[in-house]
């Protein structure tokens, strides 16, 4: 395995293999360049990238059936060489795969699932069924506006063990601190 554990959190290191999936709405064909750029950024950072065969949607926006998308996700959970799984999708189809997931396999694997938008349904199901945390983050942020700061924060957090990806300015309206488990997300 190519990860280190620090304070209960897993971090990747150079040579880590990551999986990229699409559990919700398929990407549009014109987004292939974005994915190509994302893969280049990740590989340049020393990560090995494995892409799901179900990334791009058909005329109805589906990137394979729910069973196929779930199978692609489970393939990465079953692969001991994969340290993290990043979902590049979003939309309104993620809930379709829930009944096809093997939560026992997910519970056993030492890897995080990263997703955003309606992937919250998967993130919350993983927590509810396994007690494992996931990360609410869209990895395509590494290719958007302000990509350099996103790349720096992402690499500092995942490869160097800092928390810069999760640091943002905030102000308490009431009280001075909070603690506990945060469940929720985008939906």
Question: Where in this protein do the model-derived segments appear?
Answer:
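ATP/NTP phosphate-donor binding region
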Residues: 4-81
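Metal-dependent catalytic neighborhoods of phosphoester/phosphodiester hydrolases
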Residues: 60-64, 96-102
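Hydrophobic structural segments
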Residues: 76-78, 125-127, 133-134, 180
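A short, small-residue-rich loop immediately preceding and capping a beta-strand
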Residues: 82-88, 110-113
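N-terminal glycine-rich "phosphate-gripper" loop used for MgATP/nucleotide binding
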Residues: 86-95, 116
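Short, acidic/small-residue loops that bind anionic groups at enzyme active sites
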Residues: 101-125, 133-140
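Conserved anion/nucleotide-ligand pocket segment
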Residues: 132-187
């Amino acid at each position: 395995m190519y990860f280190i554990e620090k304070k209960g959190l897993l971090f990747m290191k150079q040579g880590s293999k990551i999986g990229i999936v699409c559990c919700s709405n398929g990407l549009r064909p014109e987004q292939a360049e974005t994915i190509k750029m994302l893969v280049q950024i990740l590989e340049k950072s020393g990560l090995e990238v494995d892409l799901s065969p179900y990334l791009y949607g058909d005329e109805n926006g589906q990137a394979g059936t729910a069973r196929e998308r779930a199978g692609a996700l489970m393939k990465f959970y079953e692969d001991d060489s994969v340290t993290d799984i990043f979902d590049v999708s979003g939309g309104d189809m993620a809930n379709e795969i829930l009944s096809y997931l093997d939560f026992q396999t997910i519970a056993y694997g030492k890897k995080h699932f990263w997703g955003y938008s309606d992937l919250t349904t998967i993130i919350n199901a993983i927590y509810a069924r396994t007690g494992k945390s996931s990360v609410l983050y869209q990895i395509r942020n590494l290719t958007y506006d302000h990509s350099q700061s996103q790349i720096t924060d992402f690499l500092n957090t995942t490869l160097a063990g800092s928390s810069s990806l999760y640091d943002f300015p905030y102000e308490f309206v009431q009280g001075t601190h909070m603690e506990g488990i945060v469940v929720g997300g985008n939906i």
